[in-house]
Swiss-Prot record:
Subcellular location: Secreted
Signal peptide from the UniProt entry: 1-22
Name used for this protein in its record: Conotoxin ArMKLT2-032
Residue positions, PTM Pyrrolidone carboxylic acid: 47
Endoplasmic reticulum in keyword set: no
Length: 76
């Protein structure tokens, strides 16, 4: 019985938190948050290295192929 009461109170508390958070974002703050997130992602995005460029790992190459022995991106 005590466990049931604790679970009901926890669910009500979490529901109240969700409603409060949803109300905050519906006032226009969500738009600003989305813009900040986009700016942050664009700073973290790296451009790939073209074919013939230097590479250390295949993930850096636009073609996804790096010959590590010569350190160059190659075409697939």
């Amino acid at each position: 019985m005590k466990l049931t009461c604790v679970l009901i109170i926890a669910v009500l508390f979490l529901t109240a938190c969700q409603l409060t958070t949803g109300e905050t974002y519906s006032r226009g703050e969500q738009k600003d948050h989305a813009l900040r997130s986009t700016d942050k992602n664009s700073k973290l995005t790296r451009q790939c290295t073209p074919v013939g460029g230097y590479c250390f790992d295949h993930h850096h190459c636009c073609s996804n192929h790096c010959i590590k022995s010569i350190g160059r991106c190659v075409a697939h």
